[in-house]
Amino acid sequence: MSDDVTQRSFAAAVKDRLRRYPALYRILRSLVLPINRRRQVSRWRRNGRPVPPPHAFKQLTIEGYRRAFRLASLVETGTYAGDTVEAQRKRFRKVVSIELSPDLYRAALARFANRQNVMLLEGDSADLMESVVAQLEGPALFWLDGHYSAGITAHGNLDTPVQRELEIILASADDHVILVDDARCFGSGDYPTLDAVRTLVGRLRPDWTCVVEDDIIRIHPTSRPLHASRGERPSTAL
């Protein structure tokens, strides 16, 4: 057995033991998670920032834009296992997450059953987004990550509803911030091209910024800071 496997087995045993003491486990977890997250991001940067970036970097990016634009609500498409909801639910006053898969939706309901500021919706985000946007109380941060990626994910009418999502959000009267994951996929399958996204933003929000950096499309009012995530390189226009 390798040292790496032995270390993982030991860590799992320690975690199981600590879970017998929930209060202590929560305290230690809150201290260890930020450290692990910073290590993941540092390792990724040392390796040349390969695409896609780690989950930890995506969460730092969301947090950076939340602070820069002082946003209280987060809307996510593609709940999946609920890791983004878990990472952000204490930072936003309200978190809305839409999931197409009935199984993943039910699992998320169980995971966040007692979280009053978390609203989970089941269905196609292309159909639900208009209602969600209409119910928001002011500008929100949108994390668009709802797409078919094989495995346990669900497939709607299209591989991705992002075109319709963007049209609805950009047509809103509020100055929302939109972050779209997996920029590398655009131009393939049902994804619009990056040029098409730029054209859409220019038509509906001509005074907004539309840039891509580290596999994330960032769309937001130009009047606010561009580099919202800690340690980001200058963004590159689409």
PLM-predicted stretches and their roles:
Residues 2-141, 147-238:
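A short alpha-helical cap/connector motif
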